[in-house]
Amino acid sequence: VGSEMCIRDSCGEGLSLAAMTVAAGYADYAVSATSSDYGSAEKQFRFPLEYGNQRPLSATWTVTGSGAFVIGSKKDDDAPVSVRIKGVTTGKIVDYGVKDSFNMGACMAPAAADLIYQNLQDFDVKPTYYDRIITGDLGKIGRKILIDLLKDNGVDISRQHMDCGIEIFDNEEQDTHSGGSGCGCSAITLAGYILKQLREGSWKRVLFVPTGALLSTVSYNEGQNIPGIAHGVIIERE
């Protein structure tokens, strides 16, 4: 979260830039790291915690967490199984005119749908090519919008789709409404769960799509639109 503009897809963007830097030979190793904090996000983009406002069911809870990843040009000899970034699909800003910062899933879902559709077209594959298509923090509402938008374009990812924001919390026990959100949400899910599934062989290949939005405290208070953005990273087990 920056002082002027919040770009909430820093996990996907960081992994993409690190992979391209290493692949181009500009670095042997690059670190991609990102984080988010619940209190900071609430104070800056919603309401101070002391205010005690009631949250709508469409709201998500920003994850307090951080994840860092080392991308290298050489295989780690100490690792029994290697996981690599096979490809990247760079997304674009998509603006559907949503203004509600308490419904970020609706803001970001169109960008995720555009990215996933473009990835499938670029690599000439079907959703079944991936064991999982994993979005960052759409939450329950954003997930439904994503699946509906893709079905309108003849693509059904309902069997492959997973959202970090839905997985990160136990909604029944913690009452997190639509789910989790924030840069740290996708980062810690990738570091703590997704890579583990790949290394253990439960999955062979995933399309990792951290979702994000572009807004500032000024744009939010002026009631401007909240555009969405997403970048896709293909991660596979060798």
List where the protein language model places each region.
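Active-site-proximal alpha-helical scaffold in enzymes
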Residues: 8-32, 69-74, 181-201
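Flexible, glycine-rich active-site loops centered on histidine and acidic residues
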Residues: 33-62
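Short, small-residue-biased leader/transition segments that mark boundaries at the very start
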Residues: 1-7
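Condensing-enzyme catalytic core mediating Claisen C-C bond formation in acyl metabolism
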Residues: 51-117, 122-125, 159-167, 205-211, ...
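Short glycine/threonine-rich loop-to-helix capping motif typified by GTGT followed
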Residues: 138-153, 218-225
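A structural signal for small-residue-enriched, beta-sheet-centric alpha/beta enzyme cores
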Residues: 108, 124-127, 134-144
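A short beta-alpha structural unit
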Residues: 131-140, 167, 178-179
